């Protein structure tokens, strides 16, 4: 049985009892992407997020060295409460780890970025099928040919997540998710993936491929993995992010993020 509260979920991650993708867990609460980098680069990264708000909507920013972000949860620990972390050295993914306690530095600044998993509970309540949840897979994510707006050393390409839907469901999904810009808002594209520079939906760059049934169209949202393309391009000596699909569970309710 899934933990009922975000705090219980984080505790299960902290104990090592949960290490998988977080889609479908703690439905009424927001999940967050994570980027962690040295303070020397934090101002430029903040400007990068502000320049690319669709992909990088900020939910919280920590002080240098702080591994708690009270705005996200009272008992939250950035170092231990994500099921899996990506470690980048000089722009290359060098390892995945379950904890940052051994890597944490006094100059690290943590950025929490809204995640589209947050609005999936509302889509499901409207009867909109979420194929990756149905199939027990991670959501598929793709690099696009769309460049991000640059800020300092940070650039890279937009990453999108994809959910296949029937046309009527896609329209309803636009209506629902447009209320939540803090977790990526409305889709950026419906239909032909080639218009985004995606050649093969069966070969996602991150996550897992899912079944697209006859009569369905792919629906694409800006994705919080986008900052990882910026971190790779920037080639920082050390930077850390969540492993795609493995999010930080927050105490923020999805309802509180609605703008209308």
Curated annotation (Swiss-Prot):
UniProt family annotation: Belongs to the D-glutamate cyclase family.
Keyword Lyase part of the UniProt annotation: yes
A Pfam short name: D-Glu_cyclase
InterPro entries on file: D-Glu_cyclase, Putative_hydro-lyase, UPF0317
SUPFAM superfamilies: PSTPO5379-like (SSF160920)
Protein name, UniProt field: Putative hydro-lyase Bmul_5125/BMULJ_03391
Keywords: Lyase
Organism per entry: Burkholderia multivorans (strain ATCC 17616 / 249)
EC number: 4.2.1.-
Superkingdom as given in the UniProt entry: Bacteria
Gene Ontology terms for molecular function: lyase activity
């Amino acid at each position: 049985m899934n933990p009922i509260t975000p705090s219980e979920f984080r505790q299960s991650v902290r104990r090592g009892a949960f290490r998988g993708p977080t889609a479908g867990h703690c439905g009424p609460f927001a999940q967050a992407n994570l980027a962690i980098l040295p303070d020397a680069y934090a101002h430029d990264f903040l400007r990068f997020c502000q320049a690319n708000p669709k992909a990088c909507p900020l939910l919280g920013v920590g002080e240098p060295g702080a591994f708690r972000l009270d705005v996200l949860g009272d008992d939250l620990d950035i170092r231990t409460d994500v099921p899996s972390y990506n470690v980048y050295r000089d722009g290359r993914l060098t390892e995945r780890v379950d904890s940052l306690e051994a890597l944490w530095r006094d100059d690290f600044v943590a950025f929490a970025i809204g995640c589209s998993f947050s609005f999936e509970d509302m889509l499901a309540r409207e009867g909109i099928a979420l194929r990756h949840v149905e199939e027990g897979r991670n959501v598929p994510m793709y690099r696009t040919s769309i460049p991000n707006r640059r800020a300092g050393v940070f650039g890279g390409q937009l990453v999108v997540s994809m959910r296949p839907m029937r046309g009527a469901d896609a329209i309803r999904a636009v209506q629902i998710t447009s209320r939540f810009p803090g977790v990526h808002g409305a889709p950026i594209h419906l239909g032909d993936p080639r218009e985004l520079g995606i050649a093969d939906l069966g070969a996602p760059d991150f996550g897992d491929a899912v079944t697209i049934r006859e009569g369905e169209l792919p629906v694409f949202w800006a994705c919080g993995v986008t900052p990882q393309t910026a971190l790779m391009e920037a080639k920082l000596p050390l930077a850390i992010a969540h492993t795609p699909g493995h999010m930080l569970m927050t105490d923020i309710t999805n309802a509180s993020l609605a703008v209308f």
